[in-house]
Amino acid sequence: MQRLFPALWVVLFLVVSPLHAEPKVYGEQRIHRWWDAVTDDIAQTWEQPDRYDLYLPFLSWHARFMYDKEKTDNYNEMPWGGGLGVSRYNDEGNWSALFAMMFKDSHNEWQPAMGYGWEKGWYLDNAKDFRLGLGAAAGITARDDFANYVPLPFIFPLFSAGYKRVTVQFTYIPGTYNNGNVLFAWLRLGF
């Protein structure tokens, strides 16, 4: 009887477990599901925003260890400009936004950027006033020093810290020596 009991459990497990198994998702199906989730999120953010946002860029710091001093001495690191956007938070505290910004780049030339941002959010208190976020932004930008404003796609990481409707967001623009490697930051005010 003692041997029969474990054997019975094994047989029961082998018979019942396939009934609850989900089909595996591979390659194209996984990409299709991901793409549908992103496009649905973009549509919902556009059609049902929680907030209208004002963007105020305030920092474009060039990593000194990746630049010659002569270059950084002449760069603009105060990217005056602004932007507008729509955003929403889901039930888990994740943030989604559509945005457009215009600011002065490192060479003091105007640079537009528009796109979609998403962040996984973590609240630091029960009142949900303090929030940290980590995610990505994707979109289109253009620069004077790159083929006279030919549109350039971008995907950059996003980091944020916020209190109620005021958030500081950062991204890091990777690059090579004397090019890129910029910490870009802006203030986002939600209305």
UniProtKB/Swiss-Prot annotation:
GO terms for biological process: lipid A biosynthetic process. The active site is at H62, D105, S106. Its EC number is 2.3.1.251. GO terms for cellular component: cell outer membrane. The record marks K71 as: Role in lipopolysaccharide recognition. It is an enzyme of class 2 (transferase). The keyword Acyltransferase applies. Gene3D superfamilies: 2.40.160.20. Homodimer. This is Lipid A acyltransferase PagP. It comes from Enterobacter cloacae. The gene is pagP.
